[in-house]
Amino acid sequence: IDDCNYHLNILKLPELNIKKGIITFSSTLDTVVEKINENIYLYSFSQDEREKIIINFYLFKKEPTTIEDISIFLGVSAVTLKNDIKRIKKYLKTFMLNLSNENNKCLTITGDERNVRKLLLDILLKNYDITFKNDEIIITKTYYHGFFIPWKEMDDFFDKAITDKAYKLLKGILKENNKNISDEAFKVLFFYILVLLNRYKDHEITTIKNMNFLSNTPEYQGVKEFLKEPEFSEGELLTLTEYFLGSNTFNFDHSFYGNWVQIETFIMQL
């Protein structure tokens, strides 16, 4: 307790208290994370933390981030960062993606947009959760990837206007198709629609495989009915339809969803 309070004092946070054998703390986890990030120079990152930070930086940060910026933020040498990047590239290959050094300064995650979205979806599902109150969605953090990934940029995915629109679209499509799904499937579809709404203007999906099959499904008609905006391409409508068709497999935990992504990726490689 004394050691914890020592570090809390450095961060100018309230101390832990023990009363009748119960530890109490008057602050919140979000406040602690905010304070730690303000004093990030005091922290030494583990290898796993560094790799998660790098992936999320290049997925979510909107402004260009140079290799030097990452090295300074993480407080590591160029050699250490190079080894981290090698491991990250190996991980990204499971999503058929790459970390490209196009101008010798900034790294970019490259690959098919559908695979980029699968990685985004996988990260959002692990790091955020949803609950419902008075027919509204409440978004909370799980901190699965730790406290130092770019939370602010990730939180932008949950802008209230976009969140409300995604929720309305999902409920409308489910009602149109008279479809009941599990809570896990609802979360997957809701988060995918958020990814779609955040990315389609700059990273549009125009064509996908099995277009004829997908366009003749009832799910497609429901998607098309509620995504009437002309800016949505046929590829976007059909990709969302594909997720709805797969929603019956989203009945387990996130690891099951992750396996589904990996299996589909493996099949695409054949």
In which residue ranges do the predicted regions lie?
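A cross-family "folded-core" feature that marks the main globular domain of proteins
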Residues: 1-270
